[in-house]
């Protein structure tokens, strides 16, 4: 299968205006396209900083986390004009942010941040950004990449299992929706 994939980094999804530019770019493309987005600009660093603060027993991690929450809600406010849709997206994003808040609380309570927990925390940036952007672009369908990108552990780190991942990608995107 031939798939057109467009990757937008953090700067491309760092503000209301930049997300609206991504919308224009993607919607102007005639053929089906897969859109991959990073976390909102600066969020990955903020997620890691908050995790570090929680690990070190610094209760100010809660303030950092509340800034992460506010940033996402502000972006949603700016990119989704329809009130009903905006409220629904806010609910979905808040559900993810509540999960993330619980993870931070656990890290704070046990003063420990494993590599797996750190990776999980960072993943929320992309997951939330994807949720927002998929609700901004017309005809977009959200896919959770955790369902088709698989890894295997090798020497204490995870590497992509390309054989399984490629098969799952083909199964997931056949037929390919207009925007995913």
Where are the language model's segments positioned?
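Nucleotide/pyrophosphate-binding catalytic subdomain
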Residues: 1-180
């Amino acid at each position: 299968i031939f798939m057109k994939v467009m990757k937008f980094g953090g700067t491309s999804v760092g503000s209301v205006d930049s997300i609206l530019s991504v919308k224009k770019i993607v919607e102007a493309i005639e053929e089906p396209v897969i859109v991959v987005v990073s976390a909102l600009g600066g969020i990955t660093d903020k997620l890691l900083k908050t995790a570090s603060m929680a690990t070190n027993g610094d209760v100010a991690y809660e303030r950092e986390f509340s800034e992460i929450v506010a940033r996402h809600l502000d972006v949603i406010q700016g990119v989704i004009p329809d009130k009903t849709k905006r409220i629904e997206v806010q609910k979905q994003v808040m559900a993810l942010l509540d999960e993330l808040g619980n993870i931070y609380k656990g890290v704070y309570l046990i003063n420990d941040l494993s590599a797996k927990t750190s990776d999980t925390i960072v993943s929320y940036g992309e997951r939330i950004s994807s949720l927002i952007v998929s609700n901004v672009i017309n005809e977009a369908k959200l896919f959770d990449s955790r369902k088709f990108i698989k890894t295997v552990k090798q020497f204490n780190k995870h590497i992509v299992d390309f054989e399984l991942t490629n098969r799952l990608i083909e199964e997931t995107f056949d037929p390919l929706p207009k925007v995913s």
